[in-house]
């Protein structure tokens, strides 16, 4: 099994509900280590650039607006198969389809306000981590 890193964002809706600690607890119970974290309020240009892959999709303007409406908590998670593990913990994009006990089933309100973002693959994870964190802003937990 491979030790991987993935980017996770706790979105404005979940930050506003004050459930950051509960979400972090789920990461840790699943064996994921939080090796970098920061809270920030994304600017419109940041959100547009980060979600540029969706630029031609009809939901893009609403996504950018949503992601800039309040602070987000951004973290790098590390662990065995971190990408898949995080996506399992998050649950389906649509909270109505998410399994009970997943973050989205428990904390999300809608497909738009769905509490969390997670990288969908190794290359995306590298790009997304580099978007928010400089190399010296995360810590290698291997061997600790």
UniProtKB/Swiss-Prot annotation:
Main location: cytoplasm
GO MF terms, alphabetically ordered: ATP binding; metal ion binding; nucleoside diphosphate kinase activity
CDD domains: NDPk_I
PROSITE patterns per record: NDPK, NDPK_LIKE
Gene Ontology biological-process entries: CTP biosynthetic process; GTP biosynthetic process; purine nucleotide metabolic process; pyrimidine nucleotide metabolic process; UTP biosynthetic process
Known catalytic reactions: a 2'-deoxyribonucleoside 5'-diphosphate + ATP = a 2'-deoxyribonucleoside 5'-triphosphate + ADP; a ribonucleoside 5'-diphosphate + ATP = a ribonucleoside 5'-triphosphate + ADP
Subcellular localization: Cytoplasm
Family the entry assigns: Belongs to the NDK family.
Subunit structure: Homotetramer.
Protein known as: Nucleoside diphosphate kinase
Species this chain originates from: Coxiella burnetii (strain RSA 493 / Nine Mile phase I)
Lineage of the species this protein comes from: Bacteria, Pseudomonadati, Pseudomonadota, Gammaproteobacteria, Legionellales
Gene that this sequence comes from: ndk
